[in-house]
């Protein structure tokens, strides 16, 4: 060790003595970052005069619209009176506040974009910062020492450990201030300007850059007129005027102009105008008539093609389907307005599948949403390796043509797919063991886009270290299981199967079985059936409804030792006894659009078990409150479970983000059950929860279990509350780091004499486990490898140590987790 230090310390000192500017070319300077950006002539909150004028402009614009609507019979003449009323004092103050807030938001948006243009990290930047860097610039030292090396070793060192210096000329501040100035103009700051200074440091070969931003007054939209559109298109624009992105009084923004072009294009295509494009909308702006304001005219360009001015209707559908890319489509099948060309004796994908997948209807107007749904439904089947969808005018020579034929060219994907997975585990309770799984899937199993998957899996675990007694493992366990899944790319239900939905839908039928063996304790078999329906009408909203789910858990054999454990814990006995779980559930998931800067996700899940079965018993004359009702000779579970989860990620800059999660859940057993099944209860701890503590090692409430090796079986609850926050930063290349804070616990809804302090009360909410820690992540694009070190700060029960930090020994509060994927 001493020899290693004797070698390592001089090496570090030698590198530290190296100059970071040794290899800087003559006339160049090493870029060391930017100073804090200075802002002058920042826009201030609107004065009363400005608010008055804008209010008048808005009122006049509204009045003009009202008069136009009255003349066209779209509204009553009485509306003219309300349109002519001036703003009262209360409304005036409200308008002032709105404009002041809007001005702050406008400047904040422009400021963010300008800073993004000016940002450029120096060598060894701290988390991608443009102003701060680490003092140990090893990459630069290596580059300076080996930049002119001609030997193989020197070149290898330079390639793998060297970092080229970032020069001021490479940063190109002149170009950046021009782009930043143009960015200000794009956001309505027409008089804005960005300048810079080169700040040479003590070492003349080093320099920082100081940027100065003069924002000036933001120009706002005055009157906005949509002119020269054909009458039919003008009516469409008026009918959707509430969705306009350009509004009087708001800041002029090129971004908003572009978004309005896109909105008009989508609106027209949704109403049949297939050939209308965003580029066909143009703007005329006048900034002279009223200083500080922009009078805007929105109109179509005169050079647009004539076919863009009329709606188009769907005609026939032509599908060209090949099994392989080089196949010749020598067979033809006609079904009404559908024509299918394919290779082979049978069409690989049945005609009915195409009719269900294509949302367009012959004779109806082309709609953009139908095109998007068609692409999504065909793609969701996963049976095609290639697909091209195009719309062809039926009569290109006729100026009055209005019919589009849909033409699809597609190539089938390979039929079979297999997946083999192998993993090794090392758990905090000293259980280790391997696990393997193999899944074989057949696509397009019945020529209807179906997917049939058969999966087998197995695992083996044994207790090590303190768990071993006399050379024999205290707990040997193995598990064998299988699952058969049938997925249909549509609803499969009586009376619904033949209907054509204009939205993507799936149906999953699952049959599964699982056999668990815990040597010296029990053998259990679990079997299940499930029918689940999924659909979404919008890409951001997902629905999943399980209409039927029946699980059966049966203990095949038990030992006297296990019987004693269950006798000491009645709740554990109820949750692990032989029982049926007939259930239904619904899950709603929302995910923000990908264009949103700060992404967020939320999910609500509700599940009930045994209620329908109990109603059937009630119809047969048995009381709803009667306990120990049986299904096929075994009791069935009754409970209601609800969970809610919200996740949000705030992107602070390109290399730094703040992720958060809040989770709440409750499960309430009733009727035939005193406790919910063990698998339905909540727990905290582990790699994706409170990372300072292992799985099922906290709670419920302030209950502290005995030191029994199996006490983790007691540490589940009926209620779970948890919150997590994590600061994520990109370190080097694909290597990322994180620091986190986790808090939460589980509680019982009912008192339990065997677990004092476990019940949820107003005072027990303060019994929260708290942990912090740090970790690294290696992002391989297709997979994220994660290693976290959790550090306990507070346990929810009393310990031998007083104070908020009540971890008896520091090492007792350390949790190590190796996992795949992000925790949330």
Regions found by a protein language model. Give the residues of each.
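Sec-dependent signal peptide recognition
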Residues: 2-9
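Gram-negative/organellar outer-membrane beta-barrel architecture
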Residues: 233-236, 347-348, 367-603, 691-692, ...
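Interaction-mediating elements
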Residues: 2, 19-380, 403
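C-terminal motif of bacterial Sec signal peptides marking the signal peptidase cleavage site
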Residues: 15-17
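Hydrophobic, well-ordered secondary-structure elements that form the walls
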Residues: 378, 440, 486, 604, ...
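Solvent-exposed coil/turn segments that connect beta secondary-structure elements
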Residues: 42, 197-199, 212-218, 226-231, ...
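C-terminal outer-membrane beta-barrel translocator/porin domains of Gram-negative envelope proteins
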Residues: 340, 344, 425-429, 544-729, ...
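Strand-loop-strand
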Residues: 424-425, 442-444, 489, 753-780, ...
């Amino acid at each position: 060790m001493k020899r290693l230090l004797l070698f390592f310390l001089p090496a570090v000192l030698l590198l530290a003595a190296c100059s970071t500017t040794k290899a800087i070319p003559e006339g160049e300077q090493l870029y060391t970052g930017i100073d804090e950006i200075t802002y002058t002539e920042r826009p201030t909150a609107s004065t009363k005069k400005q608010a008055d004028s804008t209010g008048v402009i808005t009122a006049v614009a509204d009045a003009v619209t009202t008069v136009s609507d009255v003349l066209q019979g779209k509204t009553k003449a009485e509306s003219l009176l309300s349109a002519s009323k001036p703003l009262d004092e209360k409304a005036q103050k409200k308008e002032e506040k709105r404009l002041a807030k809007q001005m702050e938001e406008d400047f904040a948006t422009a400021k963010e974009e300008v800073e993004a243009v000016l940002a450029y990290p120096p060598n060894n930047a701290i988390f991608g910062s443009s102003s701060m860097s680490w003092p140990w610039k090893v990459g630069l030292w290596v580059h300076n020492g080996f930049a002119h090396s001609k030997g193989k070793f020197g070149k290898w060192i330079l390639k793998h450990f060297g970092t080229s210096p970032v020069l001021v000329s490479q940063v190109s501040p002149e170009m950046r201030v021009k782009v930043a100035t143009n960015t200000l103009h794009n956001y309505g700051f027409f008089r804005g300007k960005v300048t810079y200074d080169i700040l040479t440091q003590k070492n003349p070969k080093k320099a920082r850059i100081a940027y100065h931003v003069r924002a000036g007054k933001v120009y706002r939209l005055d009157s906005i007129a949509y002119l020269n559109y054909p009458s039919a298109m003008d009516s469409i624009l008026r009918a959707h005027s509430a969705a306009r992105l350009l509004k009087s009084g708001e800041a002029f923004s090129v971004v908003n102009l572009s978004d309005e072009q896109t909105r008009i294009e989508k609106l027209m295509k949704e109403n049949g105008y297939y050939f209308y494009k965003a580029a066909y909308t143009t703007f005329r702006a006048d900034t002279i008539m009223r200083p500080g304001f922009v009078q805007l005219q929105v109109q179509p360009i005169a050079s647009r093609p004539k076919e863009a001015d009329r709606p188009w209707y769907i005609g026939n559908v032509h599908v060209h389907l090949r099994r392989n890319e080089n196949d010749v489509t020598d067979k033809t099948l006609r079904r009404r307005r559908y024509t299918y060309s394919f290779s082979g004796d049978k069409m690989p994908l049945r005609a009915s599948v195409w009719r269900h997948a294509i949302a367009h209807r012959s004779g109806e107007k082309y709609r953009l949403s139908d095109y998007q749904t068609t692409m999504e439904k065909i793609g969701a089947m996963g049976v095609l390796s290639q697909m091209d969808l195009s719309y062809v005018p039926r009569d290109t020579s006729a100026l009055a043509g209005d019919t589009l034929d849909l033409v699809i060219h597609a190539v089938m994907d390979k039929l079979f797919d297999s997946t083999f997975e192998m993993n090794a585990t090392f758990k905090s309770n000293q259980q280790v063991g391997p696990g393997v799984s193999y899944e074989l899937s057949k696509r397009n199993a019945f020529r209807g886009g179906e997917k049939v998957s058969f999966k087998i899996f197995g695992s083996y675990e044994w207790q090590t270290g303190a768990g071993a007694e006399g050379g024999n493992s205290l707990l040997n366990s193995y598990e064998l299981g299988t699952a058969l899944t049938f997925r249909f790319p549509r609803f499969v239900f009586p009376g619904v199967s033949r209907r054509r939905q204009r939205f993507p839908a799936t149906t999953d039928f699952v049959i599964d079985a699982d056999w668990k063996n815990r040597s010296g304790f029990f053998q259990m078999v679990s079997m299940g059936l499930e029918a689940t329906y999924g659909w979404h009408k919008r890409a951001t909203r997902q629905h999943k409804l399980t209409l039927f789910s029946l699980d059966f858990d049966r203990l095949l054999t038990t030992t006297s030792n296990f019987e004693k454990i269950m006798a000491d814990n009645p709740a554990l006995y109820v949750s692990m006894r032989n029982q049926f779980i007939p259930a239904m559930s619904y899950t709603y998931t929302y995910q923000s659009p990908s264009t949103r800067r700060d992404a967020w996700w939320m999910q609500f899940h509700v599940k009930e078990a045994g209620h329908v079965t109990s109603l059937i018993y009630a119809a047969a004359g048995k009381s709803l409150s009667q306990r120990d009702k049986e299904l096929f000779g075994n009791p069935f579970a009754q409970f209601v479970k609800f969970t809610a989860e919200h996740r949000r990620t705030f992107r602070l800059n390109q290399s730094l983000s703040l992720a958060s999660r809040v989770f709440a859940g409750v499960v309430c057993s009733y009727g035939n059950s005193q406790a919910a099944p063990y698998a339905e209860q909540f727990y905290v701890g582990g790699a994706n929860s409170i990372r300072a503590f292992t799985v099922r090692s906290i709670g419920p409430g302030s209950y502290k279990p005995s030191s029994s090796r199996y006490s983790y079986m007691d540490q589940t609850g009926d209620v779970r509350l948890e919150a997590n926050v994590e600061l994520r930063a990109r370190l080097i290349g694909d290597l990322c780091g994180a620091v986190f804070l986790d808090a939460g616990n589980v509680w019982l809804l009912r008192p339990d004499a065997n677990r004092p302090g476990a019940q949820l009360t107003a005072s027990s909410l303060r019994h929260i486990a708290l942990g912090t820690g740090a970790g690294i992540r290696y992002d391989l694009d297709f997979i994220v490898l994660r290693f976290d070190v959790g550090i306990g700060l507070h346990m929810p029960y009393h310990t031998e140590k007083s104070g908020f930090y009540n971890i008896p020994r520091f090492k007792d509060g350390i949790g190590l987790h190796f996992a795949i994927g992000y925790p949330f």
